[in-house]
């Protein structure tokens, strides 16, 4: 058999080069909107395939989770150590309306807090808000030296740690989380009011510093309610409502006259 190119085989090959299709041609961009409790509402954009047959674009967007820095949401660089998770709940036009879905600390902030010569105290508790959200709050605190203390170390005893943990749970459940809804609770996380209350309450047991709600996980959410979501977002309405136009009383609308024989 002669060695060489078989021309008949190459002629029988169907088609030429494969057509290059842009993957973004069949996709649409949607704006992500944060709840009204944050200063900056436009979080960013997200991509989804267009509606094709039974595959609806808005259904593909729902329940997506976005992680955003609190510094971007509130335009404050001092809050850059917090990461906020937002979950897409509904789509209104080209806007994706989100709801708070958790919070966490950045790794560098958490590591900067842990130091020698002090005791780290952690506690976590499950709470239920008035609007039926079940959350798990993780609290972290560190002991500090008393006023006029000469000794370098400030280690707390086991009995004191147990008392502080008990106080943490009490404040997180009774005084804070269980008496408010999710929107009000998020408003307490940002200025760290829960941490300040814990620090004040445990002053008699052992002085604390750097008391934070370091992490929030949502364990269970209630059934989706569009009206409640609209309350969280504030400037959106559940349906498009037309604007009423005032017409002067003396203005008469002329009716077109019928021309006979035209």
From Swiss-Prot:
Keyword Cytoplasm set for record: yes
Record's keyword annotation contains Flavoprotein: no
Compartments reported by the entry: Cytoplasm
GO cellular component: cytosol; cytosolic small ribosomal subunit
GO biological process: translation
Single GO MF annotation: structural constituent of ribosome
Organism superkingdom: Eukaryota
Major place of residence: cytoplasm
Keywords, alphabetical: Cytoplasm, Ribonucleoprotein, Ribosomal protein
Matches recorded under Pfam families: Ribosomal_S3Ae
Family the UniProt entry places it in: Belongs to the eukaryotic ribosomal protein eS1 family.
Quaternary organization: Component of the small ribosomal subunit. Mature ribosomes consist of a small (40S) and a large (60S) subunit. The 40S subunit contains about 33 different proteins and 1 molecule of RNA (18S). The 60S subunit contains about 49 different proteins and 3 molecules of RNA (25S, 5.8S and 5S).
PANTHER family registered for this protein in UniProt: 40S RIBOSOMAL PROTEIN S3A
Protein name in UniProt: Small ribosomal subunit protein eS1
Organism of derivation: Brassica campestris
Recorded name of the encoding gene: RPS3A
